[in-house]
Amino acid sequence: MLSIEKLSISHQKLTPEQFLALPEEDITYELVDGQAIPKHEPMSPKRFHARLQPILWRILEDWCSAAECPKPGSAHTEWAILLTRQAQPWIPIPDITYISHERLPIEAMADEPCSAIPELVVEILSPGQSFGAVVQKAADYLEAGIPRVWIVDPQAKSITVFYPDAPPKTFTGSQAIQDDFLPGLKVVPQDVFAQAGIP
């Protein structure tokens, strides 16, 4: 049976099928350039990350599951997505993913990685993780066809929104994130960070 340890020693390139067949471990891995790369090591998520993830998930889930939502769908945490990066299979695992039922109908959802391009992914910075590295990941998401990427920085108490056709914009304090692409959704950074208990 394949294991992460054996693969790291052999430097064997993984196919998406081999990667998805690996046994689950305590560490979350992503498939990057044929290698199983730890998502957070050595910067394990801490309390702020753990607090922010369910709060942001709940905001997105409440919005996209409301009867009046123009783009009904579902929000997910830690759901692998089948993408392409630099012409190679790429399987990232965003902290949060929102996908509409138009892109992935309910009846097409199975206990498998996300096979459609979601509208939004959210990544929360962990201690020791460089903002630059996450910005590059945001660019990779956009290049793969995901139209919106949010990078949440607990230290700066900011949310930076990345767009495919405009420069990124950072929101702090009472600056509300409102986007015609996600109609009806309103996120105020200071409210999110206050709810998470981040001073």
Where are the language model's segments positioned?
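Gly/Pro/Ser/Thr-rich low-complexity, intrinsically disordered segments predominantly at protein N-termini
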Residues: 1-199
